[in-house]
Amino acid sequence: MIHWLEHYFDKLWPICRSITGNGVRETLRIISEIIPLNIHEVPSGTKVFDWEVPKEWNITDAYVLSPDGEKVIDFKLNNLHIVNYSIPVDIEISFDELNNHLYYIEDYPDAVPYITSYYNENWGFCLSYNQYKILPKVGKYRVVINSSLKNGSMTYGDYVLKGES
């Protein structure tokens, strides 16, 4: 039982997923190996009570290079490093400009926070406070986010487990 559970944990853990996008679809595909899910798609912009399905977000890579070219924040090492729903970016900026887009929690110096920006088109990176403290404060940083934010759909799955009564 434990081996089976670890197998699926190892398949699901590295997938970057938010409320829309290919990560959700891949997650549901894997879960469908265990139970026969019914998969549904709800288009972006659909009103659901007092909520609206946001644009679809997908990401393939994101990183920050320090002034000396070292990759100091890397989405591929930990997908929590990206603010979910970050828009595409490829720029060189100062630390002061970058600092406006960095998120950390001083009280938990080793933790990487989870931040989202569903309805406010923006970008950002999350890192531990310990990572933040050692970033060089002088020089130009290169920031790259390979993502897309466009009309698409929100995917969800359901499964009805029939009772006996």
Residue ranges and their predicted role:
Residues 1-165:
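N-terminal hydrophobic/helix-forming segments and targeting peptides
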